[in-house]
Amino acid sequence: MPVVFVAASKLPTPFATFTMHGFLDEATGREHVVLSLGDIADGQPVLGRLHSECLTGDALFSQRCDCGSQLEAALQAIAREGRGVLLYLRQEGRGIGLLNKIRAYELQDGGADTVEANERLGFAADQRDYAMCLPMLEHLGVKSLRLMTNNPRKVKALTDMNIVVAERVPLHTGHNPHNRYYLATKAGKLGHMLGNEHQGEAPQA
């Protein structure tokens, strides 16, 4: 899958001034972004996150998920460390796209959980693919990550690509009454490591 570097620029944020790197996946036409801070090509494990696009959570302040809070917390953590990388991947709705995510939300409004809704629409519970991360990390010279995630699939995906995950850093944030059952489903059916707070609240896979 050819993923090519396009351009880089400075991106000032409330947390730090990052370098924004743009990449194009020529096979899909998707445009991905990496935000980096500090020297990330020194061979030492880099604090990082793979963050899949979530328009509703990242930009529209939705409380149906924890995505926006995780994005902000990850950027804040990288800023505190003075060094890190965030890969912003254009995989809206766990890979099903924005309009299908809205369709899934409609089913959830009727009582389905996040996994059941995807499956009723004919999709897998999680359709994301992380293969594009390898050429992006290689371009940046990153060989080892301290990965901010609760998702064991991300750890496995990177490990399978021979990217060392030196440490998994939990990212527990953004919990609220509107997403409690959603998080319980992610813990119970998708294996997300959310501690004891949501374990046992949703049916197991």
Swiss-Prot record:
Pathway: Cofactor biosynthesis; riboflavin biosynthesis; 5-amino-6-(D-ribitylamino)uracil from GTP: step 1/4. It catalyses: GTP + 4 H2O = 2,5-diamino-6-hydroxy-4-(5-phosphoribosylamino)-pyrimidine + formate + 2 phosphate + 3 H(+). Binds 1 zinc ion per subunit. The active site is at 126 (proton acceptor), 128 (nucleophile). Pfam families: GTP_cyclohydro2 (PF00925). GO terms for molecular function: GTP binding; GTP cyclohydrolase II activity; zinc ion binding. Belongs to the GTP cyclohydrolase II family. PANTHER family: 3,4-DIHYDROXY-2-BUTANONE 4-PHOSPHATE SYNTHASE (PTHR21327:SF18), GTP CYCLOHYDROLASE II-RELATED (PTHR21327). This is GTP cyclohydrolase-2.
